[in-house]
Amino acid sequence: MKKSIILLVSCLITTLLTANTYIDTSEDNWTYGTMHQWQAHIAYSVIDEIAMVGDVVYALSSHSLFSIDKITEEISYHNQLTGLNSSVIHHISHNESLNELMICYQNGQIDIVDETQEIVNISDLYHKQASISKQINDICMYQNKAFLAMDFGVICLDMKRKEIEDTYYIGTNSTEVSVQFITILDDTIYALSNQTLYTAAIDDNLMDYSYWHTSPLPVGKEIQGVEAFAERVCIVRDSCLWSYHNQKWTKHPSEFSLRGLRKTKEQLFVLVANQYGAFEVMPDLSLQLTVPYGYVHDIQKDGNSYWLATENNGVVRTENNNYQEFHPDGPINNVAYRMRFFEDRLYVLPGGRWATENKTFGEIMYYENGIWTNITNGQLTDACEHPLYDFMNVAQDPNDKNHYFITSYGTGLLEMYDTTVVQLYLPNNSNLQSAAPNDPDNYTRTDAAMYDEQGNLWILNAGGDINNVHVVSAQGEWHSFNLQQHDTKDVIRIETPGEILVDKRNPQWKWIPLCRYNTGLVLLQDNGSPTDPRDDKAVYRQQWVDQYNNLIIPEYIYTIAQDHNNTIWVGTSRGLFTIPAHIDFTQSNQCEKIYVRRNDGTNLVDYLLENEQINCIVVDGANRKWIGTAASGAYLIEIGKDDNGNTDVHTIAHFTTDNSPLLSNNVLSIAIQESTGEVFFGTSNGLISYVSDASEPEKDFSNIYAYPNPVYPTYKGFIIFKGLMADTQVRVIDSSGNAVTILHSNGGEAIWDGKNSYGERVASGIYTAICNTSDGNAYGVVKVMIMN
C-alpha cells in the first residue's frame, strides 16, 4: 500500500535504530533476518467482517486486516508495516459510490483505501480532545459520505474530500447521545441509542438538535443490528427481527435465535446463533436459508457467488454449493499470555488468572521454521472429554522435543506428544490438589513447570492445602511435598506461583515467585535430591530494604529473571527491583532499585519504571533487559557505569503503539529466539516480532559468518557478523590491511553499516573481519564481499 499522507511520530531513544525501522524486504534488500524488521503473527481464523473493493476482498479478523485477490487468489496482509496508520481495527466498510474502503480503528484513527491501494489517513477524530470513547460503533454509507455512530452522537465524514464535515449532538439541547447503530432510508437518517430511535431528514440542519425527532424502540436489552430494507427499517433486538414502518414497530417471530443483520447489494441477511448459515430476508420479511454454512459473521454477494466471514474456517467463497476456504497462516488465538522458546520452537499459550485474560479456552500454538502448528480447544477437549481453560506454562522434555506438558490454572496438567493428547492429570489420577476439593474439574490450578538437569518434571500446584510441589521422575513416579521455611519449619503456602527460575550459579537453587496473597520470593535449595525433601532448604521473603534503606513490600510479583551477571530482576505491580549476585538471599533481605538520574542539574534521581506494572522481563544475548509493561509498551534497557562509577541506565528503545507497530501497550509476555535475536512480544491484541541486534554468544568462533554476503549494490541495510563470542571486538580491514572500522559485539553478533570510521561508504572489494575476545584468548576471521 502507498501512503499519501506521512505522519511524523516520536523518535525512538536509541543509538542503534534508524529512522527506517521498517526495512524493505524485497528481493533487492535481502529478506532473511533483516535487522530491525517487524513481523505480525495474527490469528486470522475467526473473521468478523468482510468488504469488497473491486477485485479485492478485505477481511477483518481479531482487529487485523488481510485481503484476497479474487482473480489470483493471493492473500495479502495489511498493517502498520504496509502503510496503515494504527493497529487495532474495529470496523471496515465499503463505499460503493467511490469504490473505497474505510478502515476504522479503536482509537479514532480512520484510513481510506482506494482501488489502487493508496491510503489517506483522517486523524481529526483521533486528535479530538474528548473524555468519551472515540470508538466507531457503526457505519452507514450514503453517496459520497459516511455517517458514523459514536458514543457522543453522529459524525458525518466526506469521503471524497477526506475530512470530517460535521458532528451532530442529537440529544435535547445538543447533549451527547450514545448512538449504537445508524442507517438511512428514503432520505431519512435513523440513529439508534439503546432505547430511543432518533430520526431526521438528511437535508435538514442536522447540527440543530430540534430537527431530530424521537420515538421509543421495542423494549429489550441488546440491539444486534439495523438495516434499511423493503421500505422498512429492520432491527434485531434480543435475537428477534423487528421492522419499523409508518411509525409502527412490528415483530416477526422466528424459530431461530438471530444475532445480526447484513445487507449486500439488494439482499438482506440475518445471521443466526447456531450452525445454520445465513438466512435471506424476503420482501414479506420471512426467512429463507440461502447460504447453508456453519457459523457466519458476515456475508457479501459477488455475482453468483457469496463471500462468507466464518467462525472457524477463515473466508469462504461459495457458489452452487461449492465451497472454497481461504486460511492465512498464523496462530489461532491472539492472546499470548505466556511464551517460551525451546531452541527454535516457540510455544504460545492463551491463558490467564484473576482478571487477566481469565477463562480463555485452552489452545496450544507453536511456531517453528516459519510455520504455525495449532491445536484447537475442540481437539483437546474432545480427546480429554473434559473442558480446558487458561493454559499457563509449558515444559518440553529435554530428550524428546515432541513430548511436553502444559499447565492450566483450573483444569489440571496436560501431557502431549506432538499434537496428540497423552493424558490429562487431575486429582483423581495424580497427586495434584484442587483449590476447591468439591470442584476439582475447575479448580486444579497448576502454573510453573520445568525439567531439571536430572530429567525430573517440576510442577507447582496452587491453592491446595498440602503437598503443592510435585516432582515427577523420568520413570513417571510422583513425589509431592510442601515448601517449609528453613528456620521456622513453617509451611509456605503456594497460592499463586509464577515460573520456576533455575539459578545459573547452581542448578540445585530454584527461585519461586509467589505472585499474590502471600506475595514474596522463595529460594529452594534441593541439595541435588529433588525427590527427597528432607534435605531441602527453603528461604521465603516478603519484604526487602533497598540501598537507601527504603522498605519494599510488593503487592504483586509478576515476573523474575536472571541476567548474565547473576543479578535477579523482580517485576512487580509497582516497578522493579534487583537482588545482585553479591547479596546472599538466604542471609539478607537487601535489594537494590535501579535509579535514573535527572538531567536537570539537581542530582535528584527517579526509580526506573516506578509505579509501572511489570508483566515480564527477558534478558538478551548482550545482557540487555527487555521489559514488558501493562500500560506503557516495551522497554529495552542497558545497565552500565558512568565515569564516576555510578549506575548508568541507557534506554536503548521504548516501543509503544504510537511509535512502532507494537499491537498494544499491554505487553503480556516476551520471548527471544537465542539463535537469531528475534524478539516476540505477546500483547493483549496479538503477537508481533522484531529482529533485534543481539543474539546469544557462542562458546567459540567455529560458526562465525557474515550476512548478507556478498553485499549487492541495491542493499542498504546493515551487514551482520554472527556466531561471535561474548565481548568480541571486530576489526574490519581492507585487502591492503588498512583498518576500516572497529565494532563491538552485542552478545553473539555485531553490526556494520558498511562505512569506514569517517562515515564514508567503503569501496567495492573484499573485507576481512578479525574477531577477538576481550581477553585475547580466542579469535576468528570472516570475509565479506561488498559490491557498489
Tell where the protein language model's regions lie, with residue ranges.
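Positively charged n-region of N-terminal signal peptides that target proteins for export
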Residues: M1-S4, N788
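Short, surface-exposed loop/turn motifs with a glycine/proline- and acidic-biased composition
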Residues: Q80, S745-G776
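Terminal processing/anchoring signals of secreted or surface-associated proteins
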Residues: D693-P697, A706-N709, G737, W752, ...
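Glycine-centered coil/turn sites that cap beta-strands in beta-rich domains
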Residues: K699-R731, E749-W752
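Extracellular and select intracellular beta-sandwich modules with Ser/Thr-enriched
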Residues: A778-V782
